Amino acid sequence: MVTIPISASTPYDVVLDNQDRWIDSVDWSRYSMLWVVTDKHVESLYGESFRSTLKLTHPHVVSSVVEAGDASKSLSQLEQLVAEGLRHGCDRETLIVAFGGGMIGDLAGFLASVYMRGVPYIQVPTTILAHDSAVGGKVAVNHPLAKNAIGSFYQPSGVYYNVTRLNTLSVQEVRSGLGELLKHAYLSRYVLESSFEDDLFLDLNENEPLDWVSWLARGIRVKQAIVETDEREQGIRAWLNFGHTFGHALESVEAYRIPHGEAVLHGMVFAFLVSGDEVRAMRLFDWMRSNDVTPIDWQPFDRYVEKMIRDKKNRHGAIRFVLLRETITVESVQLEHLQQTFEQMKGWWER
């Protein structure tokens, strides 16, 4: 078991384990009710057993189940959850339990931030990808025009991983999770004393068991170093958006056919090409191809620009990218250069 304390406006622990020992460490008597929010996929795998375990610690456990997939990160779904909470009798002493992947963490976390002007919540992630979104307190839903356009900063009371639940992830979900983990690996050389960038180019076709407690802890420590310095993204927290400018645009243009972490992988190749680092771009591209990352259904360049101009990092109408040079920079990039990069990357995939 690994415990990583996060210093924030509301401090909390991230616990990584191969079982649910964390349950015995929570003071459940503080809460009038436990409200589990999950999706249909996680519900089918773990919902009943997880709620049964919680019922051993608290007499009042209710649940809400939404459709799996990013389409559930919406205002309409949020409104439905508020209605369910009111029907359940959830009050301001209710604890929301976000039980699922990154979509559930974002949705349930934002629900916690607005339900009755704010109730506590914990994250119980079930995916590799969620090691990023579960830490740091960013919660949001999507708008049809932009991803994560409606949200807030709202820290959880704890983040609790049982990594045995990762055993049921598909190969695509593992690839997607490695997208965010690779992002943290690239950032590690700038924020930690040692880099683990070279360690993560794994052959996913080998089916060898991985020590996920150790791997996730390494990624979370990178995020810890950044968010403890800049909790509300006034400075270096923007570094965590490496790969996300083009990645988010790609997700939106593809109507979320490409999972978030795979979109970030594409976005990091794009960002490396923007900065002129073809060596790292090609190494990542080759790894993506050898591990069958979902290819892009290329659309006209303007479709992606329409999405990138709504990115939250932008200033005064200029599209900005997080770029990894000798230091990490956040730079405005001209449309002409972005189009050249787009055509270069498209050419790599089409050859």
Curated annotation (Swiss-Prot):
EC number: 4.2.3.4
GO MF, any single term: nucleotide binding
Cofactor note: Binds 1 divalent metal cation per subunit. Can use either Co(2+) or Zn(2+).
Transmembrane spans: none
CDD domains the record matches: DHQS
Gene3D superfamilies from the UniProt entry: 3.40.50.1970, Dehydroquinate synthase-like - alpha domain (1.20.1090.10)
Cofactor: Co(2+); Zn(2+); NAD(+)
Positions contributing to Zn(2+) binding: E180, H244, H260
Pathway: Metabolic intermediate biosynthesis; chorismate biosynthesis; chorismate from D-erythrose 4-phosphate and phosphoenolpyruvate: step 2/7
Binding-site residues, NAD(+): T126, T127, K138, K147
Record function comment: Catalyzes the conversion of 3-deoxy-D-arabino-heptulosonate 7-phosphate (DAHP) to dehydroquinate (DHQ).
Family per record: Belongs to the sugar phosphate cyclases superfamily. Dehydroquinate synthase family.
Protein name: 3-dehydroquinate synthase
Organism name: Exiguobacterium sp. (strain ATCC BAA-1283 / AT1b)
Name of the encoding gene: aroB
